[in-house]
């Protein structure tokens, strides 16, 4: 094992001093102070050395604290003013003559809190002008002894309060010592030779042959290095990008739709009855302006017939929902509650000839639900939804597509179980297996019902599925609270790998 010269110098310090533990000042006699930490870090990675950190909390007076130490804290200034002028009380409004503007409110509050005054008809009446103030005593102590570890618990509380009042600052000082370990002790039993070394060759060295006089230090790729956190995309953005790339690689085309939709497109076309709980204000954001939108009349009539009695163009295809369909409800505007509306609008836009061709489309975008914010719900989140339309696709194809999609996202174990959704039949939920967590639900899917497709003149089967990307991100990054994705916790953002 070949060590860097700085590592050798540091070990030589232990060898010559015959000490087991040394501090920074002691080591700096053998090696430049700025090189000690780097060499110690390398040696700790080799298990030659242990870096011991002792953290000490210090408190120090700031400008206001020093000023208060000389002239008294605001409460004392008021007491001294009354005492020096032989007054029994002063009007509250006169505090501005004694104190700085930003001291007035705090002084009165602290005088009352400490039980030193009474307020009588707008006047401040002192009970005791010769009181002893523990805060003043602590200010004096801080000026002499900044080491917070020597203070009692009660004194620490007073220090923290003085910090809140702006009299002092707290800081943490790290004192490092270095202890040689068994591997290092074995190494220094032998003489340590320090040769002049170089890390790169120049043309002059090669031509002159001087390179022979130097030791060329080899590179060790296994040496631990300091963590570097370069700029990178937000983890949620990477999830969206990854899902997008996976679907495009599977032959899907991306489609988009507007955030504001009519209830017709968001609910009615999906065969969701107008009295369904999901359409209540408790679950949906209704738009105030514009509060209504345009709905294609011909399609509206077809969807209305499907809802009321299951008929379209006089042909009965189901029982429908057997209720009175309200066209005004269909025209109300909402923030879309799912991205399925993008697929529905895509299907509605297909011409008669285009319906003969197979189609694979998906949408990744924001959706909105009137949810109470908690560890697993947000009112705004990203959803991914896709459809496959072709002559010969069936439920087995849907399962195969989903398993391949999830496999490409890194989930090798997938299981399917039955589910219910108003607009698909049959329907399923896909669960993935994660070590240490077991089986976890991830997405819902199914085959669009005829009541959804018939109004658009589509006779071919359409497979559909949807997945909440926030849920996927939580599983990927090991989060238990969905809010952590959006807290802008810089420490978490720096350390979260986005390429796993």
Curated annotation (Swiss-Prot):
L-phenylalanine binds at residues 340, 423, 448. It is an enzyme of class 6 (ligase). One of its GO terms (cellular component) is cytoplasm. It is found in: Cytoplasm. Keywords: Aminoacyl-tRNA synthetase, ATP-binding, Cytoplasm, Ligase, Magnesium, Metal-binding, Nucleotide-binding, Protein biosynthesis. Binds 2 magnesium ions per tetramer. One of its GO terms (biological process) is phenylalanyl-tRNA aminoacylation. Its cofactor is Mg(2+). One of its GO terms (molecular function) is tRNA binding. Mg(2+) binds at residue 425. Belongs to the class-II aminoacyl-tRNA synthetase family. Phe-tRNA synthetase alpha subunit type 2 subfamily. Tetramer of two alpha and two beta subunits. This is Phenylalanine--tRNA ligase alpha subunit. It comes from Methanococcus maripaludis (strain DSM 14266 / JCM 13030 / NBRC 101832 / S2 / LL). The gene is pheS.
